[in-house]
Design a protein with these regions (language model features):
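N-terminal segments that mediate ammonia production and transfer
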Residues: 1-306
Length: 306
């Protein structure tokens, strides 16, 4: 299973959250503390926005199939970047020759001209049976943008297709509604084909101004074919968050600094620190939405109505 990290708030040290914390995103790729039976060796990707930069609406984008732990370019860039919004992802695939490992399959996905980026931690079982049913729900101009072979890129195109303007800048409510609409379509197509195998769909989406994240699974716990059941399939795919003033590194380790007024939100597949006292688990079948206005973070947790 993949690992994902998303952030919205005060400028954050990219090297810190990717490489330096106890359970940094890159460390999770080879030495996770949760769902530790699965290694994420199929590449790294990120989109990072900085409101202080030129063309702040356009994120810095990086993708590489190189193992991120040994990626000197990524380490060098991470030491220099302090984004105000971020989605980063390490990709995990089953270790078979059937998997396609390449740049076109790396998350986050962001079509040319689109404002929304998406990363997915999960797996739609029997996706090959679903793929072409989704064509009727995806706008043709978006379907033509799909370059890879993943279920995740189709989910992304499906979300964009449910926005009034796929190339506009949706607010948190518009993006959350489009995400829920996409999940409903997936449920409908699964039912059409009689697919009822457990399929997690943890998503992180952002425009650089708003952030939406889901912790969700279709038919959790149902595996009709136990011969192909993996140990990593058993737990509900995790997602955690911490909110406060800013994420800091001090003498006693990393933490989200307390603040009377929230300014920053950090979401990750697992807490980035051994001390998880400042972290909360995103409820199952829930969504977090966040918007940052005038240096104040507005966020809420919603039940997913799918």
């Amino acid at each position: 299973m993949c690992r994902v990290l998303a952030y919205l708030g005060e400028p954050i040290g990219l090297s810190h959250v990717l490489f330096e914390t106890d359970s940094s995103l890159v460390r999770q790729s080879y030495n996770p503390r949760m769902m530790e039976t699965f290694l994420n060796l199929a590449g790294f990707g990120m989109v990072a926005w900085d409101q202080r930069s030129l063309r702040a609406e356009d994120p810095f984008t990086y993708r590489a199939t190189t193992l991120p732990e040994f990626d000197r370019n990524l380490r060098s860039l991470a030491r220099k970047l302090g984004p105000t919004c971020l989605i980063a992802h390490v990709r995990g695939v089953t270790h078979t020759e059937r998997e396609i490992v390449g740049e076109s399959n790396l998350h986050p996905f962001r079509f040319h001209g689109a404002s929304v980026a998406l990363a997915h931690n999960g797996h739609l079982r029997d996706f090959t049976r679903m793929r072409y049913d989704l064509v009727e729900h995806v706008r043709p101009e978006l379907a033509r943008e799909i370059e890879g072979t993943t279920d995740s890129e189709w989910i992304y195109a499906l979300v964009l297709s449910h926005l009034e303007d796929p190339y506009g800048r949706p607010d948190a409510d518009q993006l959350s509604q489009a995400t829920m609409a996409a999940l409903r379509v997936l449920r409908e197509v699964r039912a059409r084909h009689g697919i009822d195998t457990s399929s997690p769909v943890n998503l992180c989406l952002s425009t650089g101004d708003v952030l939406v994240a889901t912790r969700f699974s279709f038919d959790y716990g149902w595996y009709p074919d136990e011969d192909h059941l993996l140990e990593t399939d058993l737990p509900y795919v995790s997602l955690w968050y911490t909110v406060g003033g800013e994420y800091v590194q001090g003498e006693n380790g990393s933490r989200m600094a307390a603040s009377d007024v929230p300014r920053s939100l950090l979401i990750a597949s697992e807490p980035l620190t051994v001390d998880i006292s400042t972290w909360l688990e995103v409820p199952e079948y829930a969504m977090i939405t966040a918007t940052r206005r005038d240096d104040v973070l507005e966020y809420e947790t919603l039940d997913l109505d799918v």
